Design a protein with these regions (language model features):
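A generic "binding-loop/recognition-motif" signal
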Residues: 12, 65, 108-109
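C-terminal "cap" of GNAT-fold acetyltransferases
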Residues: 126-165
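A short, internal acetyl-CoA/4′-phosphopantetheine-binding micro-motif in the GNAT/acyltransferase core
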Residues: 72-79, 108
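A conserved beta-strand-loop-helix scaffold within acyl/acetyltransferase catalytic domains
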Residues: 31-44, 49, 55-66, 70-73
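Short amphipathic alpha-helix that is part of the acyltransferase structural core
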Residues: 1-31, 48, 157-165
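Conserved active-site alpha-helix within GNAT-family acetyltransferase domains
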Residues: 97, 101, 107-134
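Conserved acetyl-CoA-binding loop-helix of GNAT-fold acetyltransferases
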Residues: 80-93, 105
Length: 165
């Protein structure tokens, strides 16, 4: 049976949690509290095969024209089957439909994101007034995006990448 990419539901959170835990133990993804997953369920897409959730990814809107791709991961046994590409494509399409013009990610998978038009970037690509507004966020991902001292060295040592839509 084929893989379906769809918006996540609250009933998917336990499976998303399992996928995240696998990669966070390997220090390839940031761990997230379960409550944060429920709070952000509307940001997630999942890959479903035969009724099982085998992958996930999220789009987090940061600003009027800027979003972050978060938590793109596929169960190990289903890697190298283009499922991550399908998830990322759904995220990019959603970003465009929301009117976003730029997407960024923090990743070790630079080749994967590069195939989708993301390029390595140093520093935060926002104007000073937007930077000041983003400083008010308590979101750890935004702190890493802004390259704040409080999260240095970069929590995982990953690469900041940006895609212009």
């Amino acid at each position: 049976m084929s893989v379906a990419i769809r918006p996540a539901r609250t009933s998917d959170i336990k499976a998303i949690r399992t996928i995240i835990d696998t990669y966070s133990l390997q220090r390839r993804l940031l761990s997230k509290e379960t409550v944060m997953l429920y709070e952000s369920v509307q940001e997630f897409f999942v890959a479903e095969k035969d009724g099982a959730i085998i992958g996930c990814g999220a789009l987090h809107v940061l600003w009027e024209d800027l979003g972050e791709v978060r938590t793109v991961a596929v169960n190990e046994e289903f890697r190298s089957q283009k499922i991550g590409h399908q998830i990322l494509t759904a995220i990019i399409e959603r970003a465009k439909s929301l009117g976003l013009k730029r997407l960024f990610c923090l990743t070790f998978e630079t080749e994967f994101f590069g195939k989708h038009g993301f390029n390595e970037r140093q520093g935060a690509p926002v104007e000073p007034d937007v930077y000041q507004q983003l400083l008010r966020s308590y979101d750890e991902g935004i702190a890493e995006f802004l390259d704040l001292e409080s999260v240095k060295p970069n929590t995982l040592g990953n690469t900041r990448m940006l895609k212009i839509l």
